[in-house]
């Protein structure tokens, strides 16, 4: 059972698996409203949580696909405990990262020492080959080899002297400690500690669910459910002057075909609004869909296009 947190009339889904299940199995897309963990200072691409329209949340609750719960409020009495737990986890993470950084630096140092040793051996072998090539250069080559061996011996002696001193300097084995400014902080995309949440009844009006019983919500929901049962995907259409955008399939694959406007059967539609909505829909290559539920439960649809703009 998927969980949807509701607070002040906003229904949020926090789990990535739940978002995927809603889109693939139930045809409910919602819209992401959260900042990306790696790009918190931009809003061109958003991430979790997923915000559901009230009609989407109610539909999912009615068919038993999700459980609506009231989002837990922070308790000031537990604030100090939560802060202590957070600091402890941060310190444990710092110690773990410090150990991993020291291990990585030590591995790199060993790799460099191996390369230095290989280079010294190759240089010595080259000098030995050059010394046996001609007897006329034997004296000079042997003298150069002695000088190189002397310098290499001095360098290795210095390294041997530096080795014990660095190992005795501290537990870091000569590796600089990781500064706290380099600490990687994990940005949680879900609640790290479980909390108790009480179920929310969408049939009863409350602070978290103020939509129950409102005529506008009941009108929109009846039309939303009818279109959803016909296999359409729906999303909000505020910027297109409608109630819903109607897609023939997943919005990631299709453009919207209709701009749905919800009207009660007894409502009168001003001619100016009707013309404006028709012109707007045609200009964005969509058809205006006038939707009105009937007393028998059926929904009547009327499509409208502005022919002069086609």
Swiss-Prot record:
Record's compositionally biased regions (Low complexity): 128-144
Swiss-Prot/TrEMBL GO biological process terms: mRNA processing; tRNA-type intron splice site recognition and cleavage
Enzyme's top EC category: lyase
Keyword presence, Repeat: no
Subcellular location, record wording: Nucleus; Nucleus, Nucleolus
Signal peptide range: none
Active site: 247, 255, 286
InterPro entries registered for this protein in UniProt: tRNA_endonuc-like_dom_sf (IPR011856), tRNA_intron_Endo_cat-like_sf (IPR036167), tRNA_intron_Endonuc_cat-like (IPR006677), tRNA_splic (IPR006676), tRNA_splic_SEN34 (IPR016690)
Catalytic activity: pretRNA = a 3'-half-tRNA molecule with a 5'-OH end + a 5'-half-tRNA molecule with a 2',3'-cyclic phosphate end + an intron with a 2',3'-cyclic phosphate and a 5'-hydroxyl terminus
Record's keyword terms, sorted: Disease variant, Lyase, mRNA processing, Neurodegeneration, Nucleus, Pontocerebellar hypoplasia, tRNA processing
Domain of life: Eukaryota
Miscellaneous remark of the record: Belongs to the leukocyte receptor cluster (LRC) present on 19q13.4.
PANTHER family (UniProt xref): TRNA-SPLICING ENDONUCLEASE SUBUNIT SEN34 (PTHR13070:SF0), TRNA-SPLICING ENDONUCLEASE SUBUNIT SEN34-RELATED (PTHR13070)
Assembly and interaction partners: tRNA splicing endonuclease is a heterotetramer composed of TSEN2, TSEN15, TSEN34/LENG5 and TSEN54. tRNA splicing endonuclease complex also contains proteins of the pre-mRNA 3'-end processing machinery such as CLP1, CPSF1, CPSF4 and CSTF2.
NCBIfam families per UniProt: endA (TIGR00324)
Disease field: Pontocerebellar hypoplasia 2C: A disorder characterized by an abnormally small cerebellum and brainstem, and progressive microcephaly from birth combined with extrapyramidal dyskinesia. Severe chorea occurs and epilepsy is frequent. There are no signs of spinal cord anterior horn cells degeneration.
Protein name: tRNA-splicing endonuclease subunit Sen34
Record organism: Homo sapiens (Human)
């Amino acid at each position: 059972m998927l969980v949807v947190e509701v607070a002040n009339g906003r229904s949020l889904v926090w789990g990535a698996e739940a978002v995927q299940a809603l889109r693939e199995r139930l045809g409910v897309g919602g819209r992401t409203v959260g900042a990306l963990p790696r790009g918190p200072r931009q809003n061109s691409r958003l991430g979790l949580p997923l915000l559901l329209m009230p009609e989407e949340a109610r539909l999912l609750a009615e068919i038993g696909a999700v459980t609506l719960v009231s989002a837990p409020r922070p308790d000031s009495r537990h604030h100090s405990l939560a802060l202590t737990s957070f600091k402890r986890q941060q310190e444990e993470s710092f110690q773990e990262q410090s150990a991993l950084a020291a291990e990585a630096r030590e591995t790199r140092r060993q790799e460099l020492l191996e390369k230095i040793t290989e280079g010294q051996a190759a240089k010595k072998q080259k000098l030995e080959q050059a010394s046996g090539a001609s007897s006329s250069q034997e004296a000079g080559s042997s003298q150069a080899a002695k000088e190189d061996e002397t310098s290499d011996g001095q360098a290795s002696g210095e390294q041997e002297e530096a080795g014990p001193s660095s190992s005795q300097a501290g537990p870091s084995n000569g590796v600089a400690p990781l500064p706290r400014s380099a600490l990687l902080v994990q940005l949680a995309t879900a609640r790290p500690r479980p909390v108790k949440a009480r179920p929310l009844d969408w049939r009863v009006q409350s602070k978290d669910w103020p939509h129950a019983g409102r005529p506008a919500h009941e009108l929109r929901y009846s039309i939303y459910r009818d279109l959803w049962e016909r296999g359409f995907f729906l999303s909000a259409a505020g910027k297109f002057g409608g109630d819903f955008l109607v897609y023939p399939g997943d919005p990631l694959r299709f453009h919207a075909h209709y701009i749905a406007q919800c009207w009660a059967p007894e409502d009168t539609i001003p001619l100016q609004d009707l013309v404006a909505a028709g012109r707007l829909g045609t200009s964005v290559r969509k058809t205006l869909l006038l939707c009105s539920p009937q007393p028998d439960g059926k929904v009547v649809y009327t499509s409208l296009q502005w022919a002069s703009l086609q």
